[in-house]
Amino acid sequence: MVDIQARTWRAGRFWWDSSRPSEVGPHSLRALVFDLDALTDVECGGHRLAFNAAFAAHGLTLNWSVSRYRKLLALRDERQRVAAELRARGVCTECDVLLKVLVDEVCTTKSMMVDEMMLDADLDPRPGLVDLITDAFTTGVAVGVVSSGRRQWVEPLVRQLVGDGLVQTIVTADDVTTPGDAYRLALAELGAPARDALVFRGAPTSLRAALDAGLAGVLVDPGTPGARPDYDGLRVADCQRLHAQLWSSGIRSAAA
């Protein structure tokens, strides 16, 4: 694979606090790409509830609170999270041969339930999101969304969150198998090269895929110190300045 130069916004340097005018870089901002977590708290407001329902379906007296689930999100894979919880509660030991079987059963049940539960979940767009996407639409900046979920619930959820006609493309697990390919396909469908796009991510663990696709990115997560908490007051002009600063500064990082 070609080594694509990737840049991301680092926590701790706040562009909106800078009094110096931003430098105009050689790349124009032609597209904004959001992962689904950047639109709403889909993990705690959707996946967490599906896991709790799956635990109950298997007779397990486990119920993840928001705070507990956020801690477990440090583990990248949902099977690791379930296994860690089962061991912590003494349901299975580290060497228990039934651990893998039970983890697989819980995750399979959760996957079936999430398709039905997600649209009924009480999910709201992050503050300022709709205003930013509307501004992008009116100024001619393309908007795309990528998700590891199924199209049957991702597409209607996006419409539920931001309305019809404002998002030009939605890439889901039905289209590609890896997060990096999701970003690449979204850019291809938007007609924008990676260097002319800005990605908004809703979780630190999604950083690597955006980096691998050669994208500059912003972390929007109220639960991560140093990250932007939401989109309140953010407009396309601000995104253009940030995009130029990211590329002109040469910031490169594998951590948010």
How would you describe each model-predicted region?
Residues 72-118, 127:
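A metal-dependent, Asp-based hydrolase signature
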Residues 51, 129-159:
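Substrate-recognition element of Asp-dependent hydrolases with the DxDx(T/V) motif
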Residues 48-52, 56, 78-87, 111, ...:
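An amphipathic alpha-helix signature
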Residues 1-24, 151, 156-256:
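Asp-based, Mg2+/Mn2+-dependent phosphohydrolase catalytic module
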Residues 66-71, 97-102, 164-177:
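A short, structured active-site edge motif that brings together acidic residues
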